[in-house]
Each structure stands twice: as C-alpha cells, then as structure tokens.
C-alpha cells in the first residue's frame, strides 16, 4: 500500500505538552517513520508549530485524534505527498518574489 507518505500540518498547541512529548506520541502510531516539529511562534499561552510526518499509508484521522487529545488544533494542511515515492517540490519562475 502506498497512500499518504508525508503530511505537513500547521498546528496551534498549548505550551504543555512539550513538542518532544507530542513527537513521541505521534511516532507511536503505526506506519509513521519519522516526525519533525518546529516551533515558529510563541504566545503567552500557546505555540504555533509546523509538524512534518513521514511514513507509509498515514492515517490522517489517527494523527488528528492524537493532536487533539494533546490540546492541539490543526490550522491547515500545508502539504500532502502520496504515491509510490516522495516527489520533492520543484521551484518554478512563479515562485520568485
């Protein structure tokens, strides 16, 4: 099975649990090979984090359930990669600023 191989999420979460705990909880799910969490904004009570998850045949509903059980809210799905292999994004002339 191929299914979803990478998903990138923008998440708002409370300061607790720590991102280390969130990463370990997510990696306990089946089919997840790795998790990368980056904090890009901190407010008084919350953190905005970018979560990149890679694996094979990822179950978005399971991932969302874990995030919500830890007090997180998914703001957006910023990238999804599916299929037999991961295709990296290619820059085009439209991407220039």
From Swiss-Prot:
State the protein's name: Uncharacterized protein MJ0319
The organism named in the record is Methanocaldococcus jannaschii (strain ATCC 43067 / DSM 2661 / JAL-1 / JCM 10045 / NBRC 100440) (Methanococcus jannaschii)
For this protein, the record's InterPro entries field holds: DUF211 (IPR003831), MTH889-like_dom_sf (IPR023129)
Matching Pfam families, A to Z?
Answer: DUF211
């Amino acid at each position: 099975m191929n299914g979803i191989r990478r998903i990138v999420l923008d998440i708002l979460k409370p300061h607790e649990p720590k991102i280390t705990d969130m990463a370990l909880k997510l990696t306990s799910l089946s089919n997840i090979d790795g998790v990368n969490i980056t904090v890009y904004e901190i407010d008084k009570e919350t953190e905005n984090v970018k979560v990149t998850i890679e694996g094979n045949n990822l179950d978005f509903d399971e991932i969302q359930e874990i995030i919500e059980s830890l007090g997180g809210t998914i703001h957006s799905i910023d990238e999804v990669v599916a299929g037999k292999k991961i295709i990296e994004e290619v820059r085009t002339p439209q991407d220039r600023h």
